[in-house]
Curated annotation (Swiss-Prot):
Gene Ontology annotations of biological process type: positive regulation of response to oxidative stress; positive regulation of response to salt stress; protein targeting to membrane
Role: Palmitoyltransferase involved in the positive regulation of salt and oxidative stress tolerance. Palmitoyltoylates the salt tolerance receptor-like kinase STRK1.
Swiss-Prot/TrEMBL catalytic activity: L-cysteinyl-[protein] + hexadecanoyl-CoA = S-hexadecanoyl-L-cysteinyl-[protein] + CoA
Entry similarity comment: Belongs to the DHHC palmitoyltransferase family.
Record-annotated DHHC domain positions: 160-210
Protein name: Protein S-acyltransferase DHHC9
TM region(s), chain numbering: 3-23, 76-96, 114-134, 206-226, 236-256, 269-289
Superkingdom to which the source organism belongs: Eukaryota
Main location: membrane
InterPro entries to which the protein is assigned, alphabetical: Palmitoyltrfase_DHHC, PFA4/ZDH16/20/ERF2-like
Species of provenance: Oryza sativa subsp. japonica
Disruption phenotype: Hypersensitivity to salt stress with lower survival rates.
Active-site feature positions: C190 (s-palmitoyl cysteine intermediate)
Length: 382
């Protein structure tokens, strides 16, 4: 009877940690325990570790930890790539060893044995394409084409030279300090791919996210059908109601069915929960990057716009204060976060994305990059 509550507690703690890690820096959580958990996970735990190592082992050990940090965070390395391969390989191996014996089953066709292999193979192919394809490196040879392809908007992108590459930096490009190169239509540096995500490989990255979301969802659903088939074939509900006199209702059957499943099929339950959580996280990333593609925006540009809007708001507030105007504070952070109303000063701050050409053309630009079109080649010859 205590097992379901244990699962609820485990799920609640997991959800709190995930939400704190991903969303703890949102303004809505400022000053709350969610922000404090986020700070501990992203900075605090590491700083405490450094202090502990320094106190226990001295400067040499501390410098060693800092060297490992530099290798892992400031230079290209395959650590997360290896971790990804290990996660996929170990998870699929466990599923084959523990769950393929139930395929075919009451609700699951034997075809899924082979579909799973194809699904994992396609995921691995997308991983390789994203990891090892050129993200759109800007060089002295092609910089003129990129300068023509993306105009400067004069707000978040202004004409300037890359201080490292010593070439003009096109609009939407950024110099990646990890890869040490300028990348056109820079989105972000992805440690999982050990590669930048830019103009030429955003399509592979988005396809990778969507496909892995579908794989995890598919795996969780199939495992659920396996468990449902086992309940049906073993007549668990019938035995509980007829032989043990359990009330034939959800509230009466659930604790006993859950106990039986955890006792007999705990591996399948853990795998299904794991895949469902990963699918939920990937679904969020898919939605976010789909939104970026539809609006022809990148992660880097999103941060730039946030910084610009915050700067403009600060300027407006200073002007209002200088003019003796008093702005009423919102009643709460939650209302401020979800409210659609804006103050007079806020309405003057407009995000003017000149690269947004409509959803269809935006998606075409992602999946058929400008640098792979004939017009781009003609600019080179000109």
């Amino acid at each position: 009877m205590d097992v379901p509550w244990l699962l609820v507690a485990h799920g609640s703690v997991t959800a709190l940690v995930v939400v704190s890690f991903l969303c703890g820096q949102w303004p809505i959580f400022e000053g709350t325990f969610v922000q404090r958990i986020n700070h501990f996970l992203t900075f605090g735990a590491y700083h405490h570790l450094l202090r502990l190592v320094h106190a226990a082992c001295g400067n040499g050990a501390r410098d060693l930890v800092l060297g490992v940090e530099s290798y892992c965070c400031d230079r290209p390395n395959p650590i997360l790539q290896i971790f990804y391969v290990a996660i996929i390989g170990v998870t699929y191996f466990i599923i084959v060893q523990t769950s393929f014996q139930y395929i075919p089953g009451y609700y699951v066709s034997g075809l899924h044995r082979y579909l799973s292999i194809v699904a994992v193979a396609i995921g691995a192919l997308l991983f390789v394409l994203t990891s090892f394809s050129d993200p759109g490196t800007v060089t002295a040879e092609n910089v003129s084409q990129y300068l023509s392809a993306y105009p400067y908007d004069g707000i978040i992108f202004e004409e300037k030279e890359c201080s490292t590459c010593k070439i003009a930096r096109p609009a939407r490009a950024k110099h990646c300090r990890i890869c040490d190169k300028c990348v056109a239509r820079f989105d972000h540096h992805c440690g999982w791919m050990n590669n930048c995500i830019g103009e030429k490989n955003t399509r592979y990255f988005v396809a990778f996210l969507v496909w892995h979301f579908l794989i995890c969802l598919y795996g969780a659903v199939i495992l659920g059908f396996i468990l449902a088939g086992e309940l049906k074939e073993r007549k668990v509900v019938y035995i509980l109601t007829v032989y043990y006199g359990i009330d034939n209702s959800f509230s009466g059957l659930f604790p006993h069915v859950a106990q039986w499943l955890l006792a007999v099929h705990n591996t399948q339950i853990l795998l299904a929960v794991f895949l469902a959580i990963i699918a939920l996280l990937l679904g969020g990333f898919c939605a976010y990057h789909t939104h970026l593609c539809l609006t022809n925006t990148t992660t880097n540009e999103t941060f730039k716009w946030q910084d610009y809007i915050m700067w403009r708001k600060k300027v407006n507030e200073e002007k209002a204060a200088a003019n003796g105007e008093v702005r009423k504070s919102p009643p709460s952070k939650w209302k401020a976060f979800f409210s659609r109303s804006h103050t007079e000063a806020d309405e003057t701050i407009v995000k003017n994305n000149i690269y947004d050409r409509g959803m269809i053309r935006n998606m075409c630009e992602v999946f058929v990059p400008l640098s792979e079109r004939q017009s781009f080649s003609r600019k080179k010859s000109d």
